[in-house]
Amino acid sequence: MADQNERAFQKQFGVNLNRKVKPGVTKKKILRRYRDVGLGFKTPREAIDGTYIDKKCPWTGDVRIRGRILIGVVRKTKMQRTIVIRRDYLHFVRKYSRFEKRHRNMSVHCSPAFRDVEHGDIVTIGECRPLSKTVRFNVLKVNKGQGAKKSFKKF
């Protein structure tokens, strides 16, 4: 059963929790729906075996990944199920024929399938429909970051 820590009963869409049990079956199987997002990304083991309920998860929810696939570095993990990533890039200034450093911060939905996302990790994100006012991307893969490094670094 899922963790019930909200006011409304948490259940996965499309799963009947009141299903009749076949006679002679003793092992109770956890009813869970998951799918493959495609694009070469593997479904995390936590999404298959876990008990979390997240309607915005690309594996267990009703969100489709389409559009852009981007990479960024985790900056903040203080929100619930949402992280802030930083994307660094270079902008060319024609007057001086030089590049200047710029960056963008993006709010990204992080599924509970990724338990230990920390500051400095490199994440791959995929575009989806708008999930809130500022969130339009979902975390698809997490690579652990290397300890101390420069603040501006192109992957």
UniProtKB/Swiss-Prot annotation:
InterPro entries tied to this protein: NA-bd_OB-fold, Ribosomal_uS17, Ribosomal_uS17_CS, Ribosomal_uS17_N
Pfam families: Ribosomal_S17, Ribosomal_S17_N
GO molecular function: rRNA binding; structural constituent of ribosome
Species per Swiss-Prot/TrEMBL record: Drosophila pseudoobscura pseudoobscura
SUPFAM superfamilies referenced in this protein's UniProt entry, alphabetically: Nucleic acid-binding proteins (SSF50249)
Signal peptide region: none
Keyword set, alphabetical order: Acetylation, Ribonucleoprotein, Ribosomal protein, RNA-binding, rRNA-binding
PANTHER family linked to this entry: 40S RIBOSOMAL PROTEIN S11 FAMILY MEMBER, 40S RIBOSOMAL PROTEIN S11-RELATED
Family: Belongs to the universal ribosomal protein uS17 family.
GO biological process: translation
Record-given protein name: Small ribosomal subunit protein uS17
Coiled coil location: none
N-acetylalanine PTM sites in chain numbering: 2
GO-annotated cellular components: cytosolic small ribosomal subunit
Superkingdom of the source species: Eukaryota
